[in-house]
């Protein structure tokens, strides 16, 4: 046989082998064929879409993009029948604002804010002279708008073609007289499940699928039929609902048709985006604020807490303070989308945390509502610009009554599709383990728990008891049957812990106290020292002038004295690498897409189809 014939025979064998592999079901590469090896890495990142869904804004883009696309996370759906009542999810309004105690709570919160402003001296060593609303009210009430133009330049979204739905900016600018319902599918970081129209889990997931698919097609220019070539990185909250995450993963893989997915927590992605290995991550969003300590890519479960307030609450508080000062735009309504956008803009423009800016100052703003003249208002403000953002540290000022304001990490409700969840592990524990656990619970609950007052005065065992999560009541009742009289005490201990946690979650912690609580929940003093030394602030809710210095001052003053002596500097980072703090977590998701270790985290469509939620337990980079 000649050399050429030998070569042909070998080529034939290779082709035959490839055919055999295909028949045996070896996975084909996700990247389209005929790609030179040198471009493989680049193409892989280019074929990964990073999605960071927020309560108000959706951020998404390819992993290779410098910045993500930001889209209002809202959808307008056309009425199916004529005469259907209009429905719209609230933006700045929320439950618990119109209770009899709300106004008294607001006033008490404002007194604490004023006391804090007066107690901190300005940089020249003098105290601020407070400005009362009466000093501005008479001036502001005299002000009348000047007409800049008879046409504002803005228009309502054209709905003459009667589209079934509108997404993002188009949904925000739907005329209120048109027959469309407005839905925000995520509220306070969780799926917006409610008893009203469009509030079922199925309806919310359908809204999310439409918004994300529309954004991918319009802004990333990826046809939906090509998503089988793409993979997705999804950012989820630190305190997540397992059922909701499972449904989102199912939607992305099985309905939208992505080839694979990696799910990771926002706080860990924020550390990737900022280039920090260990830090206390403070994510102040529009609707919620989450705090947790991250060390070497791991979010410590017992340090996580979520506060049910954010930037939109500051906007609403600023409106209340401006009303006290005679706000000249008297037609402003919190139920009007255009006015909500205006109030958000005024907060971002005028509010600050700079003690040195004091006294009365003149300001002006424009109103450019669709199909209305452009108006110019002039008005005068004093301390209101500082008081509103300080409500984040004194949340009683928001006037929210009877709502759960703080969420800790709890044991999940269990999932019948997940055979190795915590409920299964509890049920299969030996009697000795259960008895030992009951005794430990009894001992821990016998100690007094003080939730009132400043957190720095509390004993160090508080975090340990809070982070141990709620013990499953059914398993405790099982202990009662096995352990006799001892188990009655254990059940009492369990109930007292549940009551303590319930009391704690009913209180609205200020941002500084939440950070101190989170750090105090770390397991060792070395870790606590690391966290006090590095506090990373992300999200758009604390983007105020001098916020960095203000937060640093409050943490230093309230830190336990034992740490104040040994920590040289509390480093509060509000703009890592000079990046917009709202984009840090998304950027971290893009970094995650490029890491070699991420290859082990992908969950593929076929695997999900076969094994379901068990793949999250196997592949997630955090404890599922």
Swiss-Prot record:
Residue ranges, annotated region (Disordered): 1-29, 430-462
Residues carrying Phosphoserine: 132, 412
Subunit relationships: Component of the chromatin remodeling INO80 complex; specifically part of a complex module associated with the DBINO domain of INO80. Exists as monomers and dimers, but the dimer is most probably the biologically relevant form required for stable interactions with histones that exploits the twofold symmetry of the nucleosome core.
GO BP term, example: regulation of chromosome organization
GO molecular function terms attached to this record: ATP binding
Chain sites annotated for binding ATP: 55-56, 283-286
GO cellular component: a single term: centrosome
Disulfide bridges in this chain: none
InterPro entries assigned to the protein according to its UniProt record, in alphabetical order: Actin, ATPase_NBD
The keyword Plastid is assigned to this record: no
Modified residues annotated as N-acetylmethionine in this record: 1
Domain of life from the UniProt record: Eukaryota
Keywords for the protein's UniProt record, in alphabetical order: Acetylation, ATP-binding, Cell cycle, Cell division, Chromosome, DNA damage, DNA recombination, DNA repair, Mitosis, Nucleotide-binding, Nucleus, Phosphoprotein, Transcription, Transcription regulation
The organism of origin for this protein: Mus musculus (Mouse)
Composition bias, Basic and acidic residues: 1-25
Family: Belongs to the actin family. ARP8 subfamily.
The UniProt record lists the keyword Signal: no
UniProt name for this protein: Actin-related protein 8
Protein function: Plays an important role in the functional organization of mitotic chromosomes. Exhibits low basal ATPase activity, and unable to polymerize. Proposed core component of the chromatin remodeling INO80 complex which is involved in transcriptional regulation, DNA replication and probably DNA repair. Required for the recruitment of INO80 (and probably the INO80 complex) to sites of DNA damage Strongly prefer nucleosomes and H3-H4 tetramers over H2A-H2B dimers, suggesting it may act as a nucleosome recognition module within the complex.
Cellular compartments annotated: Nucleus; Chromosome
